A protein has these predicted regions:
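Ligand-binding pockets and gating/stacking loops
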Residues: 1-146
Length: 146
């Protein structure tokens, strides 16, 4: 088993990774739904970057792209069958509804019943919020009003 960090041979490695992830993830979600567990369970599938939309040098891989990538949420309180955000036609930059990491984390915390504005830590003598002062809940992905 390889990983998603495909600086070379992206076609084969991503095809293999997608096969490893696709059916088991769908089976997990369907099984949890069938057992009535999905309504109380939040599933988060995330990454910190995507891949560039063009090949790296003369190779067969792609470099990191921190500007546009995909994450998904399923289950407890997440709107079903919904896509939020959009990249440009090349998948290089965000074209609509950008989401910062702080927003994504604030939304996850909200779905877990936690007020992200009250969660903080001390660093260098300052109290800092986990979601910084910029993080906000992405209300459009919620199945109910926040």
């Amino acid at each position: 088993i390889t990983n998603w960090d495909s600086h070379s041979d992206i076609a084969d490695t991503h095809a293999m990774q997608a096969e490893i992830m696709d059916q088991p993830t769908a089976a997990l979600i369907n099984d949890m739904k069938r057992r009535g567990l999905l309504e109380d369970t939040l599933i988060v599938w995330a990454t910190e970057f995507g891949r560039m939309p063009f090949l790296q040098g003369n190779g067969t891989g792609r470099d990191h792209n921190p500007e546009a990538f995909t994450c998904f949420l399923a289950g407890a309180g997440v709107k079903k069958g919904f896509s939020y955000g959009e990249s440009d036609e090349f998948g290089y930059k965000v074209a609509a509804d950008p989401v910062e990491v702080y927003d994504f984390n604030a939304t996850i915390l909200h779905l877990m019943g936690l007020d992200h504005e009250r969660l903080s830590f001390y660093h260098n003598g300052l109290e800092r919020r986990l979601t910084n002062v910029h993080g906000h809940v992405i209300k459009d992905v919620l199945a109910w009003s926040a």
